[in-house]
Amino acid sequence: SSDDVSYYEEISELLHATGKQDMTVSNAVQSYSQKIAEQRKADMLFGVEGMSERLRWIVNKPISRDLLREKIDLCMSTSGKLRVIYQFNLPGETERDIDEFESDVEYFRAKYTTGALATTFIPNQPSAHTPFQWIVPRYSLATQARLMDLRKRFIGSGKTGLGVYLPTPLGPKNWFSQVVAEWLPVTPTLDAAIQKLPQRAEVPEMIDALAARGVRLPAAFLARDRDAVFPWSNIVTTGDDADKWKRFEGMNRKLSSERFARGTSLPSAPEI
């Protein structure tokens, strides 16, 4: 899929050479260059994951705030259009991370009087066969409410300058149904229980709502230790991390580090 692959410069060169510059592609932010920008004929998409520099560091996409602004500047000044994909409900996320995103948007709003910037937010879903499969699923209603407030504020922004669009994020009920479908067989009983879930609730309340209708999730859904057995544990994969748990522990060390607490740019700091 060209929508969820981060192409580097070599692939962009191939697209240019074969006349495929009109494909909608996602470009690795770090490799986006003036040459690539000039070759593009379709919208560019950046998948940056975290809405702040420190969250991007946590999920192993260490894109500094300065670099992100530089690459978005390059795209906006060349084509005037860009889609940026973020995740929310990431580990360690607080109001300060949304503040940083909002500040970045205001930076571009102050700089550009025309153009379109789409900022899509996807609720984090623990990824199978990655170090992040041990992240306990959560959905912050406070974060969702803040994003919806920003969405309302951005409506009509194109009439006075740079148009910023923030699509409605997937809500907790629909998100939770996707997560549960990875853990339980989809049966009429499960479907009926899912349909009765509250529209806006956090994970513990939704788990209780399922249990009240006779649907119980395995203990490993919330208790994800090193020996947890996942629904996908019997599937053998190749070419990925040899020790995923070690990488997950590294993420936890990052979360408790001074660097994460400060949230400052330290591009030369070694990875944990």
Task: List PLM regions with ranges.
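Flexible glycine/acidic-rich beta-alpha junction loops that bind and position SAM and/or redox cofactors
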Residues: 54-59, 88-96, 115-141, 160-191, ...
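Conserved SAM/AdoMet-binding glycine-rich loop
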Residues: 1-118, 122-127
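Phosphate/diphosphate-binding loops
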Residues: 19-28, 143, 147-158
